[in-house]
Amino acid sequence: MNYPELSMNTILGKLFSVFAFAMGVPAQDIEVAGALMGKKMVVNEFVAYLDMVHLKATLDPKTIAITSFALCGFANFSSVAIQIGGIGELAPSRRSDLAKLGFKALIAGTLASYLSATLAGLLL
């Protein structure tokens, strides 16, 4: 099977476009903003910000503002691994508790960033 139009950006754009829509991203930029938010979650925020810099000329200013807030934060899978590894060394007996809380912390951090982005979208 060969699907050249199917990429990580396309999949993440479709999945996270719901959040971009809810935050108030203009309709023409929803999928691009969703792809950036998904890339932040899967890879990290630095890669997503670098991609956004290259798209800056094509995006609506409101999209840039909302997406900047949505990308701000360390809620991604690599940060959860760093948390488990770093704090797990300080308290090795609690490593399983950290692993259980890692996903919840990821969701909470993501929702906090998305709430800030939504408020920015309301005020713009």
What are these regions (language model features)?
Residues 40-124:
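C-terminal transmembrane helix pair
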